[in-house]
């Protein structure tokens, strides 16, 4: 059933793009999945030929990778092989659309340049270097400071609404 749904999704995406392809209004479509299908531990152990706890950092990262694409009906430089955490996809989209970035998105933009993948599993640098969970000491001082700034602001954004820096997470409501 999963593969037949993939085929149906492909058809729907094709229809969506064909609909917007020739419009005069600039249009951007962002498509991604937030997780791989839940195929069960047995499936992954057969796939890797080992117990899940014995996987390399790279193999653990692979389990969490999901493809995405950004399509526009106007000229946009084509990029392939972009690897980033889904929490940074909104910032990349805003950059490509030419939107002004909030303070929080500017922090995300710096993170995109330094640690484009930052998850509970670990980190990936732009050059592809992986740092697994528990190896935060492998981060440079600059990377660690940037990631700590991000974690603090993410916490503030989610749990401390009364202490939000004015206009940092979105348009200033006073303006």
Residues covered by each model-derived region:
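Solvent-exposed soluble domains appended to multi-pass membrane proteins
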Residues: 1-175
